[in-house]
Design a protein with these regions (language model features):
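N-terminal subdomain of nucleotide-sugar transferases
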Residues: 2-54
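Glycine-rich, highly charged phosphate/nucleotide-binding loops
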Residues: 61-74
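Membrane-proximal helix-turn-helix segments that form the acceptor-binding/catalytic region
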Residues: 70, 101-106, 122-138
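Short acidic/histidine-rich motifs immediately flanking catalytic phosphotransfer sites
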Residues: 77-81
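An aromatic- and histidine-rich active-site surface loop
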Residues: 82-106
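A short, histidine- and acid-enriched strand-loop-helix "catalytic/donor-clamping" loop
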Residues: 87-91, 108-125, 138
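A short helix->loop->beta-strand "cap" motif at the edges of active sites that frequently abuts
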Residues: 106-109, 158-160
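Donor nucleotide-sugar binding/catalytic pocket of nucleotide-sugar-dependent glycosyltransferases
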Residues: 134-169
Length: 169
């Protein structure tokens, strides 16, 4: 075993709470999370998928969100990193807000993974979205053009940004 790998395995063990759409949901975030779950990094980083959003009636959505937040109260403390898979819409961000607050109270690293870059143009006046970006430790985007757009449209957001081109590589 290489020395660097040994150091990484012993001293850099991280556990990641992955927050996003429910397994039972449909759409891009669920598709990405299903793919990530099959990758070696999922096991290496001891990831746990906490589904917060589900399609259906308002009652069903609210009940699902409540259960996820309640579950987070008990499990978030076991994780070092909380990785939010989200879009700029206020509804999804509002549902995930209590978990972000818990992460901040627990001094966890918070990653905001923005899945729908083409919505960046439509949310420049969305103060809640801007607030979210400013309170995360890293913002992940799926393409360099979204990184450029984010930097251009949201100059007030100083949070470090990275691009993940293809999580499968």
């Amino acid at each position: 075993m290489r020395f660097r790998q040994l150091i990484e395995d012993v001293f850099m063990k991280h556990r990641v709470l992955v927050v996003g759409a429910a397994r039972e949901s449909t759409g891009g975030v669920t598709t990405v999370l299903n793919l990530c779950e099959k990758m070696p990094m999922w096991k290496k980083w001891q990831c746990y998928w906490l589904g917060t959003q589900l399609h259906g009636s308002y009652g069903r959505k609210a009940w699902y969100a409540f259960k996820a937040i309640f579950r987070a109260i008990f499990i978030i403390w076991k994780y070092d990193i909380v990785h939010f898979h989200t879009t700029p819409d206020k509804g999804g961000l509002l549902i995930q807000l209590p978990i972000l607050i818990m992460a901040k109270i627990g001094r966890k690293k918070a990653i905001m993974h923005i899945h729908v870059g083409n919505q960046l143009n439509d949310n420049t006046e969305n103060k809640f979205f801007i607030w979210w970006m400013q309170h995360c430790d890293v913002i992940v985007l799926l393409a360099k053009k979204w990184l450029n757009l984010l930097s251009q449209k949201y100059p007030q957001v100083k949070t470090p940004k990275v691009v993940v081109y293809n999580a499968c590589e």
